[in-house]
Swiss-Prot record:
Family to which the UniProt record says this protein belongs: Belongs to the shikimate dehydrogenase family.
Quaternary structure note: Homodimer.
Class of this enzyme: oxidoreductase
Pfam families: SDH_C, Shikimate_DH, Shikimate_dh_N
Pathway of action: Metabolic intermediate biosynthesis; chorismate biosynthesis; chorismate from D-erythrose 4-phosphate and phosphoenolpyruvate: step 4/7
Ligand binding (NADP(+)): 80, 130-134, 154-159, 213, 237
Source organism of this protein record: Neisseria polysaccharea
GO CC terms: cytosol
PANTHER family linked: BIFUNCTIONAL 3-DEHYDROQUINATE DEHYDRATASE_SHIKIMATE DEHYDROGENASE, CHLOROPLASTIC, SHIKIMATE DEHYDROGENASE
Protein's recorded name: Shikimate dehydrogenase (NADP(+))
Residues forming the catalytic site: 68 (proton acceptor)
Amino acid sequence: MTALPRYAVFGNPVAHSKSPQIHQQFTLQEGVDIEYGRICADIDGFAQAVSTFFETGGCGANVTVPFKQEAFALADEHSDRALAAGAVNTLILLKNGKLRGDNTDGIGLVNDITQVKNIAIEGKTILLLGAGGAVRGVIPVLKEHRPARIVIANRTHAKAEELARLFGIEAVPMADLNGGFDIIINGTSGGLSGQLPAVNPEIFRSCRLAYDMVYGDAAQTFLNFAQSNGAAEVSDGLGMLVGQAAASYHIWRGFTPDIRPVIEYMKAL
């Protein structure tokens, strides 16, 4: 009996990851069987865990917090997206034995906004809250969709200025934000502890979409705040999660899943 193609998500912690359920739905669309598991790597043992996985028949891997920068360093080759982001969330073992790293976070975000929510990015004014790896990973793909303006704001302004210089966008101190944004994307981790970004509630007044890159309960504090202060539509990052997974699946298998039914399936769990 031929062994099933093996894939996994690496993280620490990783027990909460919904990636196995998502990829199971993709296999139903493609009509195949694969093996997809969770691997909790030791904080100082990521490289060894990945090496063991691929040496024992692994075909591809997703990488989540806190290993995306390590995955970048581990990859022998990188996509343009990964190079721009400085982080890798997708690894594939090539036929020549080398590991190629990609970053599909930006694709996941943009596809959720433009294809699922039918909100155009082109010509819009976008505010990014936060300046960590999650935000850095999505800026290159947002820029490809030609917004009129991207503004970044972070609690530590120097970090926002650093990303602004790197990507040719604007940095504005959080306290100085005063509205005029079509799309506001929260990439801070404050929601995990129920904290809000220190922004003027007025910035949501003309906002078409307020989006939190995390999903589930952790997004609700920000989304409730945005909605109660005038945001026309709010969304957590479940669609981004499914979208980035679909892009990874395509890299591994050459099959492009339809993310809409999978998003609805995951919402119902």
